[in-house]
């Protein structure tokens, strides 16, 4: 098993091969010895559990990064709409302003809906040659804010999940340490009895 399997962000599948014990003519093969040794089996199970928890945490970490980036990018577009709304507010109630092309493209690419409509459908229904009144501009900003908030929430939930996975990793490591300690004690006692 390569160390790349347990690094943050690794997408590699978990591969684990049980190879505990020693192999020589007196003791038989490694597999025979590990099957007879409950400590080796326990150690193997805990290592597999450790790798599984780590893989889940890795995937969640990648999700958190994506959600954070999406929330940040969406908030930038929302701030851009603030400027357009402020410009529209300087005119009268019928003043219309153009929705920035990069905002339209961003909403289209990320599937952000306004009142259940795509940005293209919304512009076709309420737009006037790519321009919207203040209410329409505010509806677009609200849709962007909702998307940013949703991704921020997903990011927070992901961080909580990672914290829980870290606690589970620590618990498994504690169990591994205890098992290795007991394994060593028993091996030492057997060696003393055998060779004394």
Curated annotation (Swiss-Prot):
UniProt-annotated location(s): Secreted; Cell surface
Task: Supply the alphabetized keyword list.
Answer: Protein transport, Secreted, Transport, Virulence
State the family named in the UniProt similarity comment for this chain.
Belongs to the EspA/SseB family.
Q: What is its main location?
A: secreted
Task: Supply the Pfam families for this chain.
Answer: EspA (PF03433)
InterPro entries (alphabetical): EspA (IPR005095), EspA/CesA-like (IPR035074)
Gene inactivation effect: Mutant is severely attenuated in virulence. Disruption prevents SpvB-induced F-actin depolymerization in human macrophages without affecting intra-bacterial SpvB protein levels.
Q: What does this protein do?
A: Effector proteins function to alter host cell physiology and promote bacterial survival in host tissues. May act as a translocator that mediates translocation of SPI-2 T3SS effector proteins from intraphagosomal bacterial cells into the host cells. SseB is required for correct localization of SseC and SseD on the bacterial cell surface.
Descriptive protein name: Secreted effector protein SseB
Q: Which GO terms describe its cellular component?
A: cell surface; cytosol; extracellular region
Induction, as annotated: Expressed when growing intracellularly and is maximally induced 6 hours following infection; expression in host cells is dependent on an acidic environment. Repressed in conditions of high calcium and by osmotic stress.
Q: Which GO terms describe its biological process?
A: protein secretion by the type III secretion system
Q: Give the source species.
A: Salmonella typhimurium (strain LT2 / SGSC1412 / ATCC 700720)
How does this polypeptide assemble, per the annotation? Answer: May form a complex with SseC and SseD. Binds to the chaperone SseA.
